[in-house]
Amino acid sequence: MLDLFNKHIDNNLPFLHGKKLLVCVSGGADSVVLFSLINKMNYTIGVAHCNFKLRHKESDDDSFFVENLCKINSIPFYSKDFDINIPKHSVQMAARKLRYDWFYELLELHKYDFILTAHHLNDSIETFFINLSRSTGIDGLTGIKSINNKVVRPLLPFNKSQIIDYANDNNIKWREDSSNLKDNYLRNKIRNKLVPILRDIDSDFTNNFSKTIYRLNESNLILKEHIQNFKSVNFQTKNDEILILKTALK
């Protein structure tokens, strides 16, 4: 996987080379593997860890684990405890906003160039079904974006099995999040119930779905380019007004 990861960076994310990177590490397998891969490539990195106290001692143990990982590797470690008191159905969305707001604060304060998160192919599949269930357009069916402003997701082409295999093959330890086994959230229900059924139907479901998301992204780009070309030819801006040429309405 290390060779594939290096090639992916060289071919698709070459702008990361020589940059200062803030790696977001929860302590789970995905983020610890991302940390390991990036650290082996000799980037200048720091690690950011959020503790939302949602699992009490387990959450504190995660923080200690990540802090110790950074000490062993002599990597700068940034940690923040969040005390959120919000309705259960809003926890994930609120936590996400708090998390990314803080990551961007660290980016500015410590002069990092990019924020790296450990989202992978399985996460993108789950996001597809979440958006599909809530009604969406083509944008919502393209999965998780590999690049979003300063946030980069280098593991997106890799599936969960590849990540776990790499961790086991390299004796990498990680923390298990017990909440992932519960079906309290829609994402967990999709991960634990829907996706296994789809894999039973087609053992190569994950790889096939990856191709589908790729094609949807390509189609979305073509559509956006067509719309932009149409606007550039038929729309005009004048005195804070947008004018549409009559020929465009025929």
For the regions a protein language model found, what residue spans apply to each?
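ATP/NTP-dependent adenylation/nucleotidyl-transfer catalytic domains that generate, transfer
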Residues: 185-250
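Core alpha/beta nucleotide-donor-binding catalytic domains of modification enzymes
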Residues: 1-195
